[in-house]
Every structure is written in C-alpha cells, then in structure tokens.
Amino acid sequence: MKVPLGLWKVSRGNLWSTQKRVLTMSRCLNSDAGNEAKTVREGPAFSADLYMHPEKWKGLPPQRILELYWERMARLGSEYKPNKDELNALLTTSEYSNVPVNDIKKLYHRGEQGAIDIKGGNVNRDNSLRPFMFDELPSQAQELVAQHREQRFYNRLAAYELPLLAQYRQEYKRPSPESHPVTYRYTSYVGEEHPNSRKVVLSVKTKELGLEEKSLHKFRILARSRYDHTTDIFKMSSDKFEHASQNARYLHDILQRLLAESKDLTEDDFSDVPLDTRHTIAKSLRKKKRDYEFPEHWKRPEDAPKKKFDIVDQLLSTL
C-alpha cells in the first residue's frame, strides 16, 4: 500500500536523518521565543514541549500530529515508548494520509515489520554468506566452463554413438507415381509460429489418377480453374483449419469426392462440354517474357573496343 508523504516508512536505520530534521524545526520554533507576537508558521502558536503531551494532540491538524509524532520519537530516542493517547491522535490522520485505521495500528506497534506485512513482502532476510561451493572461478568463467562441458558431451556422442546408427541405413526409393500420385506440400518456419504454417497444397497430374477417358474429362470439367491444361496438374490448397494435418485431411476428402463424382457417368458425363482454358491463357499472358533476341542488323562489330596488348599471351607464345 502506498503511504503518502512517506511518513510511515521510517525505520531505525534512517532515524538520525529524522532527528536532524526535527532539531532544525525546533530551532525555528525557538528562534523567536522571546517575541510573543510572532509564530514560526501561519496559524495558532504551539508550546515547545507539546510533543511531550500526546493527550493534547487530538483536534490538531493531521500534518501537525504527524510532525509531533516524529519529533517525539526523535527527541526521546531509546527512551521512547508507545502511548495510547498518541495512537488515538494518529488514528485521526487516517483520512488525511489515506491509510486505513488497521494499517496505522500495525505500523505504530510493529514499525517497519508492519509495513512489510501490509505490502505482502517476505520479512525473512538471509544476509549470511552462502557456503563455499568449491567454485573458485567467477560467474562468467563458470558459464564458459559449462559451455565447454556441453560441447564435450556432444563431441562424445558424435564420436562413439553416431557411428552406431549406420546399421539402420536404408536406401531411399522414390515413391512410384502410380502408387503415390498425389503430392502434399507443407510450409514450416523453424523456431517460430506462423499462420502460414497450417496451409497445405495438394497437387496431382490427372493422367496419373488411373481414370478412364470419359471420367478423366469429367474430372477436369469439375476441377474448373484448379486444373492447368498446359501442365496437366490439378492443384488446390487449404488453410481453413488450425493445424496442417486437418487441412491435409480436408483436401484428401475433397479429392475423393471428386474422383467418386467423376467415375459416376450415369447421370451426366459432360462429354458435350468443352474444357475451359481461359484462366490458363490469362495466367500465361500475365507472365513477363524475358527471352528477347537481339536483332542481327543492330550488331556493329566495327564499333567494338580494340583489344589491348596482353603480356600474358605474348609470354606464352614465346615459350
């Protein structure tokens, strides 16, 4: 809890600074003691020993009560003892200092310990030196030693255990397009999460699906713009679901439904519907062609820079 003015957080460690402040204030109070018409501050005048009479504090301004409280603590020093009248006067400053009454009681009776309890801190302080752990090196050097130890651990793995994996070698055999015609492409970002990592792209050549001619034509008609007639590749993608495996399963189900619909020629085989290639043509037109040929009549070999004397060729010819 934040205590305004810092009046409740003074401990015995900084009591000397409080005493100096109170003594300075007392000098100001007693500087014009012979002149009864003058006072140290605006308002009614107070007796110099008012701090010794807590029973007279009640009814004074809250700021004045707090000043008298600290003055009494500083002047009495080790002879200071809590007083019931003093506590009752301090409780009247609750609204001014924005500190609850119960917290004022804790601070009054327990001091710094009460302030720590109010804040919810740990009062058990262990200021003793830690036992010697045979770590004669400083912390930075200990980290370097730990890194070196870790590197040696992996070096031992590479030297003694990795060669044992040679007995599990298997020759790589590329899957046959006849048995595995469909390709699923995944995108992974190592060490980070990315929304694009859930996207899966399915691609397959329609001739490798093993369909009859009429079923193959119907499949291409149903595929619409997802079929490229120049490469004979059917492609579709999905990032509808959260995980890539879910999107791959979704694409697999869509492909199976397309195949089942293509093989069903009972209702309509779309034999009278031509293949739509407009999307493929538009895609090829959007591509930038860079296979330009330099015209022959633009070439001017007579304007080419003349070859300078090459000393290396001259030396090689003389040998």
UniProtKB/Swiss-Prot annotation:
Subcellular location(s) of the protein: Mitochondrion
Keyword Ribosomal protein: yes
Pfam families, per database record: MRP-S28
BP-aspect Gene Ontology terms: mitochondrial translation
Protein keywords: Mitochondrion, Ribonucleoprotein, Ribosomal protein, Transit peptide
Protein name, entry field: Small ribosomal subunit protein mS35
Top-level taxonomy: Eukaryota, Fungi, Dikarya, Ascomycota, Saccharomycotina
Transit peptide: 1-30
GO cellular component, one term: mitochondrial small ribosomal subunit
Subcellular location, principal: mitochondrion
GO MF term set: structural constituent of ribosome
Native source species: Saccharomyces cerevisiae (strain ATCC 204508 / S288c)
InterPro entries registered for this protein in UniProt: Ribosomal_mS35, Ribosomal_mS35_mit, Ribosomal_mS35_mt
Function: Component of the mitochondrial ribosome (mitoribosome), a dedicated translation machinery responsible for the synthesis of mitochondrial genome-encoded proteins, including at least some of the essential transmembrane subunits of the mitochondrial respiratory chain. The mitoribosomes are attached to the mitochondrial inner membrane and translation products are cotranslationally integrated into the membrane.
Alphabetical list of PANTHER family matching this protein: MITOCHONDRIAL 28S RIBOSOMAL PROTEIN S28, SMALL RIBOSOMAL SUBUNIT PROTEIN MS35
Keyword check for Transit peptide: yes
Similarity section: Belongs to the mitochondrion-specific ribosomal protein mS35 family.
Further comment found in the protein's record: Present with 3150 molecules/cell in log phase SD medium.
Subunit and interaction comment: Component of the mitochondrial small ribosomal subunit (mt-SSU). Mature yeast 74S mitochondrial ribosomes consist of a small (37S) and a large (54S) subunit. The 37S small subunit contains a 15S ribosomal RNA (15S mt-rRNA) and 34 different proteins. The 54S large subunit contains a 21S rRNA (21S mt-rRNA) and 46 different proteins.
